[in-house]
Amino acid sequence: ERGHSLPDILLLKELCRILEISADDLLGIENRKITENGNDLAQEEIWHKLQNCLEPLECIFGKDLVPVFLDGTYQEKIVEARKKLAGEGILMPLVRIRDDEGLASREFAILSYRQTLRKESVETEIEDASYIVECLEKTVRENYAHILNRDLVKDMVENLQKKYPALIRGVVPERISYGYLTDVFKQLLKRGLAPWYFSRIIEIMDSECRRNPTITEEELVCTIGKKLQEK
């Protein structure tokens, strides 16, 4: 806990990734009592606050920006941003939005797993929704390796299987676990690889892992990077 009463969120996130289980399963949310008096409402609030710390994408804002997120314009703009990012091979997670009294009235921040990725103030009310969504889109694009998690990868794999069943069937998660695929994909993204290579990454991973079952993650990342650069 690093000397605090709060859990180490980064450690919790990493344990979920390694064990390939959800935070609910790891924390035993369904069957553990964590209040001294057995107060169900208090227990629910505690788990809710803890789960909030595991949000891959969150936008918090000051009181004067609340109307922006109640307006239909925000919903329309965020859908457009999702479509644009999808065309680049990026699956944008759902954005949790909430007001925060700790921010200035026209200030907003974009967080991932409680880490602040961007924070600034909106100086004018003109096109507030457009500007904030533009910032969200840019932040996701620039920080996708940090935002990406096993659930997003699983959704991408399942969608890919609909169009290319032979590529996925018997491969993911049978030979390549979602956790391992996520780790390799994140490392390649950090090296500047474009996300739209996702299907080729799976194809090369499967080939290399069958050819050399003892290949390390670092060797695999290097091999995939080289093969994709040859194209």
Regions found by a protein language model. Name each.
Residues E20-T35:
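Short C-terminal boundary/hinge segments that cap the last helix of small helical domains
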Residues K13-E14, I21, K119:
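Generic detector of low-complexity/intrinsically disordered segments
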Residues P7, L11-C16, L26:
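Hydrophobic micro-packing sites on short alpha-helices
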Residues G38-K231:
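Membrane-embedded alpha-helical signal segments
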Residues E1-L6, I29-N31:
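Recognition helix of helix-turn-helix/homeodomain-like DNA-binding domains
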